[in-house]
């Protein structure tokens, strides 16, 4: 059974001196929105877990779907289309990919835009595939031209400490999916070169501190109160 949820987005505007704010409805009628990334002050890209990549004009309220051929699994539990980030005229999305034989992976695709649609969209990264149906992550962030992406440990726990697996890791890659030569473990032959951090469970939040130097992530831990 498919559930449609009407979600209302709000713009929150602050008056820091008077500590005043107001809520303004921007758009409604969305179906499980998961990630969004601003193009400019008036436009943004938004993903829905059901697989859509939408472009929303905050001024005209126009919602445009960007069709694609990515093998996004039917949304269930934590699976589906995940995060999106817009960078220099290109789109990067993370999603739960159907890898066949009931296996899935956290995958990242890069989309090129021409005439307000995708001229090409293709995978640049695929984590290992698994039958487990939990903990894909995933959030995306750019810093200094490099893409940071969080990958869940797929419910396998200790694999997050395994340097030969992408499960339970933060990766750092170039726009084409290759590993930067200065990644922390790139010189260690026993480690996957894309790995930036190990030991994560289900990281679903990431941000760059305002001073543009420190990265913060939110990692869902085993206990509900343990973040």
PLM regions with names:
Residues 9-10, 40, 44, 191, ...:
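A generic structural signal for solvent-exposed, polar alpha-helical segments
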Residues 3-15:
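Sec-dependent N-terminal signal peptides
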């Amino acid at each position: 059974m498919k559930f449609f949820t009407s979600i209302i987005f709000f713009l929150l505007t602050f008056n820091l001196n008077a500590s005043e704010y107001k809520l303004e409805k921007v758009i409604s009628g969305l179906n499980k929105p998961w990630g969004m990334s601003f193009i400019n002050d008036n436009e943004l890209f938004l993903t829905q877990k059901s697989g859509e990549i939408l472009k929303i004009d905050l001024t005209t309220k126009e919602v445009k779907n960007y069709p694609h051929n990515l093998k996004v699994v039917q949304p269930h539990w934590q699976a589906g289309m995940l995060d999106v980030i817009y960078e220099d005229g290109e789109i990067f999305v993370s999603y739960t990919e159907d890898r066949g034989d009931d296996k899935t992976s956290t995958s990242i695709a890069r989309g090129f835009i021409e005439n307000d649609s995708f001229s090409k969209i293709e995978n640049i990264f695929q984590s290992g595939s698994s039958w487990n149906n939990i903990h894909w992550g995933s959030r995306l962030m750019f810093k200094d031209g490099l893409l940071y992406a969080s990958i869940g440990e797929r419910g396998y726990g200790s694999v997050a400490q395994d340097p030969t697996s992408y499960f339970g890791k933060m990766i750092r890659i170039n726009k084409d999916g290759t590993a930067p030569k200065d990644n922390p473990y790139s010189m260690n032959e026993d480690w996957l070169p894309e790995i930036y951090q190990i030991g994560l469970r289900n990281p679903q939040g990431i941000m760059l501190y305002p001073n543009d130097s420190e990265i913060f992530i939110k990692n869902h831990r085993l206990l509900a109160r343990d973040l």
